[in-house]
A protein has these predicted regions:
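Surface-exposed helix-capping loop/turn segments at secondary-structure junctions
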Residues: 82-85, 136-143, 168-169, 258-259
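The substrate-binding groove and active-site-proximal loops of carbohydrate-active enzymes
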Residues: 112-118, 144-149, 237, 265
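Short, Lys/Arg-enriched N-terminal segments with co-localized hydrophobic residues
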Residues: 10-25
Length: 290
């Protein structure tokens, strides 16, 4: 494959030229199989690359930025090797609760209250701050950056189909994904049902609306948090999307039904990426990520 030098900084090019040989085979670590594998995209020469972006309620810290630097190195290396890369990053500006287990206040709302600003003011300020740091680290801007709040119709479409096909259910005013309806829900991790609290960054509140402890919210209505600033009309009631459905909706919208690479922080393997796989493959009816 012919190498592409356009759009890559000189320092990075020098490094790549010194470490990559013509006969080298690109291998990537696959979290799903827990081993390095030869990278073969679904479509020869093209790469669909999705990365989970920041929740813009505060400044990104050095650990967050280390993650994005890693994605940037991979993005630039793929382009250097001649791949036609389309990289998409979301911006989470709604729906990410303080606990990954669907409990606690929305991080955006909490930050807005603390700083006496609107949620959208908070989102704009910290999004701008994030990309200022991103560029200062010489990271290449993704081809598409999409805020979660710009894609509500996508989430509604996906949730509606999941309800129709029995993968989701309504309870207590909210819509939940039923993890018992999918095979090998824990394929990305070693977690089990009775270990669900492990890996959740903050305390787990029991939700008696759920059929299974590991079920997760696709859509919250006003029955969950009456003071939620951002709400939209939907067939399920006035409310807002859950965190996990946002990445699925944005990825499918911009990259289609087959994804080559999904990147994110190791702290998102469970439950976020685990839930993404479950809902995406239930919706699509086939394997989602390469």
């Amino acid at each position: 494959m012919k190498k592409r030098l356009i759009g890559l900084d000189k320092f990075f090019l020098i490094i790549l030229k010194n470490i990559i040989k013509e006969e080298d085979i690109m291998q990537l670590y696959n979290t799903l199989t827990r081993k390095k594998e030869e990278f073969i995209p679904y479509v020869e020469g093209k790469v669909g690359f999705y990365t989970c972006g920041p929740t813009v309620y505060h400044y990104a810290h050095i650990g967050n930025m280390r993650n994005y630097i890693g994605h940037d190195i991979l993005d630039k290396t793929l382009r250097y090797l001649g791949y036609d890369v389309k990289r998409v990053m979301n911006i989470t500006d709604v729906g990410h609760l303080k606990s990954d287990s669907d409990s606690g206040e929305d991080k955006m709302v909490a930050s807005a209250k603390k700083e006496h600003k609107t949620v959208m003011d908070i989102a704009k300020y910290y999004t701008d701050a994030f990309f200022k740091d991103f560029k200062a680290l010489n990271c290449r801007m993704p081809d598409i950056v999409s805020p979660a709040t710009d894609n509500i119709d996508e989430y509604i479409k996906i949730i509606s189909k999941l309800l129709e096909e029995g993968y989701a259910y309504k309870a207590g005013g909210n819509v939940y994904f039923d993890v018992s309806k999918v095979d090998d829900y824990y394929q990305l991790t070693n977690h089990k049902e009775d270990q669900m609290v492990v890996g959740v960054r903050e305390g787990v509140d029991f939700d008696d609306n759920k059929r299974n402890q590991a079920d997760f919210a696709l859509w919250f209505t006003k029955s969950k948090f009456d003071d939620q600033d951002l709400k939209w009309n939907s067939p399920f009631g006035v409310g807002y999307p859950g965190w996990h459905i946002e990445c699925t909706g944005i990825s499918l919208k911009y990259l289609g039904e087959y994804l080559d690479i999904h990147g994110g922080g190791v702290d998102n393997i469970f439950p976020h990426h685990t839930n993404e796989i479950a809902q995406s493959e239930a919706y699509l009816g086939h394997k989602w990520c390469n």
